């Protein structure tokens, strides 16, 4: 009888598998592979090698605390001669001396997560069991049988592997790109993402069922959407919008997801203070990309928050055009969410592809603060019965806005506001380029088209189908020149009279600081004209000067000012309203890289900024981070005030660990100039 087969060790071939599975950055200490794709391992035996005629090898894999074959979280499979599609299989690749090289293949619909791999070896009546090791299984955008399969290599690189990008802020008229370090392959982030799944309420309620359902990107996406906010659970971020961030970090100060996720884990899964929509979206993007789901951050300008699902935002204003009463239904200057790419076997054909997920806690969905995934295609078609949360997302990009003006005598008049259109310039980063891609057409048909009317009819969007009133008068807000932080500038109410009548009107022109979610701050400029003559077929521009001394103490970190013009013709009771959000441009952060950018060789980043304000800056700090360039955030404090017009400059050491293209992201903070962002692309060559 042959002697017992004894395993000496198992080599999980981290380098080879990491390269083949696009997980090299994750495979430095553990095996991380993607489902539906073979991976390799080598068994080293003592004394003799495996003999097919006398030895039997059976492998087992388990995941989760309560594995079962029925749930798909446990499998036993023998060594086979060939791969069986859709099943766990192990086949021999090579055999030499006392080593056996194997190929293991996982099903393309296996649950993702941490697995234990074991071997049962038997020779005759003798048998032994060995734990070969652990591996983490991810979704696989490279596998055609996987629900997250993307057929474009460029898109797979961008939406799964790229660790840096941009998030778009500002306003629809002045779109501002904010650099962000997603860092999904940075040390410890994958483990944190798995912890996030393991503390979600569905896992705590029924761990076996939760682990089984991790085979579905729809399910995982919905869990992540709920876990990025902390409103119902041990989620990552606490949202705050009142500009009081003293006991945490201002949402505008973050420059990456890595620091946020590490803080959450290091403090026992306690919420991190504070987040707003783009921070929630960016952290969700990091987690989903890390787990293998192609994901991108999306910004919608003039985004509606419709609480009662009537697709209508009604503003009740006083005679000066100021919003009165309940402000819960608002138009946000911009709002960010994520889109993830996946099939939807739970829905009708045609709804695969990009799915919208919104982790910002706004409304409950099935009892939890989460939103989506909902097919972007369903939003475009007005199919509001589609899972999940289609009416809310449809309203964000399509809600109608009605303004009512109430006079002192109690009478209410409908105002015409042509300046506020919901769902503009829906934006995401372009594939492979540091540019913005406009994806509005994926959410909406062209305005006025027959397809748009069909979608609105399907959604029962009666307000949008109604004919718009025309008065022969038009008004819009114009700006004279670029608006830089610290400067004085002019804005104009530009009025056009397209009728043969002469009118004498009242004009109120007002500027107020505003948060990105539409909450107004103090006035920073106003003009009231009681008798404005508008001659037939004429145009007139009325200027308003906005002074730095008026807005400096009340501007939020969003750098936004809302200008409102209300034109009233009292004889015919005509009310015309125009609004525009102005974004004040921060100064440029200049970044120089000193030294030859090579792997594992020290580099120096020289970072500088010129104070654009007419006053000194105090409490100045620079913070930098970049996946592959820094192991953690680096912060330098400036001890002395930076006088008006003066340049402040610091140097920081970097140690790039990985070759290729990286982004160094910088944030500048001070007492009067906050959340100034900058970035520099750095290409690291081989050592």
Curated annotation (Swiss-Prot):
Keyword annotations:
Acetylation, Acyltransferase, Calcium, Cell membrane, Chromosome, Cytoplasm, Disulfide bond, Extracellular matrix, GTP-binding, Hydrolase, Isopeptide bond, Membrane, Metal-binding, Mitochondrion, Nucleotide-binding, Nucleus, Phosphoprotein, Protease, S-nitrosylation, Secreted, Transferase
Alphabetized SMART domains for the sequence: TGc (SM00460)
Compartments (UniProt record) = Cytoplasm, Cytosol; Nucleus; Chromosome; Secreted, Extracellular space, Extracellular matrix
Provide a GO CC annotation, any one: nucleus
Post-translational modification remark? Disulfide bond formation inactivates the calcium-dependent acyltransferase activity. Cys-370 can form disulfide bonds with both Cys-230 and Cys-371: formation of a disulfide bond between Cys-230 and Cys-370 facilitates formation of the disulfide between Cys-370 and Cys-371, which promotes inactivation of the acyltransferase activity. May also form interchain disulfids between Cys-230 and Cys-370. Ca(2+) protects against disulfide bond formation and inactivation. Auto-transglutaminated: Forms covalent cross-links mediated by transglutaminase between Gln-633 and the epsilon-amino group of a lysine residue of itself or HMGB1, forming homopolymers and heteropolymers, respectively.
Q: Report the EC number(s), separated by commas if there are several.
A: 2.3.2.13, 3.4.-.-, 3.5.1.44, 2.3.1.-
> Chief localization class?
cytoplasm
Entry similarity comment: Belongs to the transglutaminase superfamily. Transglutaminase family.
Give the linked disease: TGM2 constitutes the major autoantigen in celiac disease, a multifactorial chronic disorder of the small intestine caused by intolerance to gluten. Celiac disease is characterized by immune-mediated enteropathy associated with failed intestinal absorption and malnutrition: intestinal inflammation is precipitated by ingestion of the protein gliadin, a component of wheat gluten in the diet. TGM2 is the main target for celiac disease-associated anti-endomysium autoantibodies.
The identity of this protein, by name, is Protein-glutamine gamma-glutamyltransferase 2
* Native source species: Homo sapiens (Human)
């Amino acid at each position: 009888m042959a002697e017992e087969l004894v395993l000496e060790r198992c080599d999980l071939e981290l380098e080879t598998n990491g390269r083949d599975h696009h997980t090299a950055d994750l495979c430095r200490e553990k095996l991380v592979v993607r489902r539906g794709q073979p991976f390799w391992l080598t068994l080293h035996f003592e004394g003799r090698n495996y003999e097919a005629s006398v030895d039997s090898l059976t492998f087992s894999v388990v995941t989760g605390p309560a594995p079962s074959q029925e749930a798909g979280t446990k499998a036993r499979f023998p060594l086979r001669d060939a791969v069986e599609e859709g099943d766990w299989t192990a086949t021999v690749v090579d055999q030499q001396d006392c080593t056996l090289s194997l190929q293991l293949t996982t099903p393309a619909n296996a649950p993702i997560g941490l697995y234990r791999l074991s071997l049962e070896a038997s020779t005759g009546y003798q048998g032994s069991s060995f734990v070969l090791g652990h591996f983490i299984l991810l979704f696989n955008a490279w596998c055609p049988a996987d629900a997250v399969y993307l057929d474009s290599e460029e898109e797979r690189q961008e939406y799964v592997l790229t660790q840096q990008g941009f998030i778009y802020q500002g306003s629809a008229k002045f779109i501002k790109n904010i650099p962000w370090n997603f860092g999904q392959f940075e040390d410890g982030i994958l483990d944190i993402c798995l912890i996030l799944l393991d503390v979600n309420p569905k896992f705590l309620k029924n761990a076996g069922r939760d682990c089984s359902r991790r085979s579905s990107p729809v399910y995982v996406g919905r869990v992540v959407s709920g876990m990025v906010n902390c409103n119902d659970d041990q989620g990552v971020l606490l949202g705050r919008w009142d500009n009081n961030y003293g006991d945490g970090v201002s949402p505008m100060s973050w420059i990456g997801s890595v620091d946020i996720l590490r803080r959450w884990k290091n403090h026992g899964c306690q919420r991190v203070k504070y987040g707003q929509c783009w921070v929630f979206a960016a952290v969700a993007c990091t987690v989903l990309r890390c787990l293998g789901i192609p994901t991108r951050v999306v910004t919608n300008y003039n985004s509606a928050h419709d609480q009662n699902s009537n697709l209508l935002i009604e503003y009740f204003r006083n005679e000066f055009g100021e919003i009165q009463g309940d402000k819960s239904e608002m138009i946000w200057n911009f709002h960010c969410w994520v889109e993830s790419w996946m099939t939807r076997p739970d829905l009708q054909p045609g709804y695969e592809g990009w799915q919208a997920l919104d982790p910002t806690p706004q409304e409950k969905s099935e009892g939890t603060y989460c939103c989506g995934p909902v097919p972007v295609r369903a939003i475009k078609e007005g199919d509001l019965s589609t899972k999940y949360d289609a009416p809310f997302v449809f309203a964000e990009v399509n809600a109608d806005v009605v303004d009512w003006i109430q006079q002192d005598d109690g009478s209410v008049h409908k105002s015409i506001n042509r300046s506020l259109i919901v769902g503009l310039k829906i934006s995401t980063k372009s594939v492979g380029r540091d540019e913005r891609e406009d994806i509005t057409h994926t959410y909406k048909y062209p305005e006025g088209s027959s397809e748009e009317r069909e979608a609105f009819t399907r959604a029962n969007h009666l307000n949008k189908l109604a004919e718009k009133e025309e008065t022969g008068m038009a008004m819009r807000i114009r700006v004279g020149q670029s608006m830089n932080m610290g400067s004085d500038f002019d804005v104009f109410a530009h009025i056009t009279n397209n009728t043969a009548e002469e009118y004498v009107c009242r004009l109120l022109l007002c500027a107020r600081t505003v948060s990105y979610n539409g909450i107004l701050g103090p006035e920073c400029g106003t003009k009231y004209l009681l008798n404005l003559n508008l001659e037939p077929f004429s145009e007139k521009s009325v200027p308003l000067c906005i002074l730095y001394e008026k807005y400096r103490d009340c501007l939020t970190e969003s750098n936004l000012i809302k200008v409102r013009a209300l034109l009233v013709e009292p004889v015919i009771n005509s009310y015309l309203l125009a609004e525009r959000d102005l974004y004040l441009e921060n100064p440029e952060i200049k970044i120089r890289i000193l030294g030859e950018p090579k792997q594992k060789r020290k580099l120096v980043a020289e970072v500088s900024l010129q104070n654009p304000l007419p006053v000194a800056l105090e409490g100045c700090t620079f913070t930098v981070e970049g996946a592959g360039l820094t192991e953690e955030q680096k912060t330098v404090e400036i001890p002395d005030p930076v006088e008006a017009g003066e340049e402040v400059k610091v140097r920081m050491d970097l140690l790039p660990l990985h070759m290729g293209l990286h982004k160094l992201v910088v944030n500048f903070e001070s007492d009067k100039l906050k959340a100034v962002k900058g970035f520099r692309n750095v290409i690291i060559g081989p050592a």
